[in-house]
């Protein structure tokens, strides 16, 4: 099963023209954390999920790939 969150965060970051480092700085995390999210190696907290959704102006459902 594919991790839609991992796919979506990577796609949104690339659409915004951001590097993993730049996104990490904007969200207040380290670059490795963003990398782990994008590879499905780490989940984020609910608070961070909301912060990411707000940053990209999407819903948490969209970020998680829930239809």
Please report, for each region that a protein language model flagged, where it lies by residue.
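Alpha-helical residues within the helix-turn-helix
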Residues: 14, 25, 54
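Conserved hydrophobic/aromatic packing and binding residues within compact polymer-binding modules
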Residues: 9, 23-24, 34-37, 63
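DNA major-groove recognition helix of helix-turn-helix/homeodomain DNA-binding modules
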Residues: 47-62
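A short, Lys/Arg-rich alpha-helix, primarily the initiator
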Residues: 1-15
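Recognition helix of helix-turn-helix/homeodomain-like DNA-binding domains
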Residues: 28-43
């Amino acid at each position: 099963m594919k991790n839609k969150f991992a796919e979506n965060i990577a796609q949104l970051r690339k659409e915004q023209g951001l590097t993993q480092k730049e996104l990490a700085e904007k969200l207040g995390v380290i670059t490795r954390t963003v990398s782990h999210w994008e590879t499905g190696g780490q989940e984020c907290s609910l608070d961070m999920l909301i912060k990411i959704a707000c940053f990209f102006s999407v819903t948490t459902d969209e970020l998680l790939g829930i239809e």
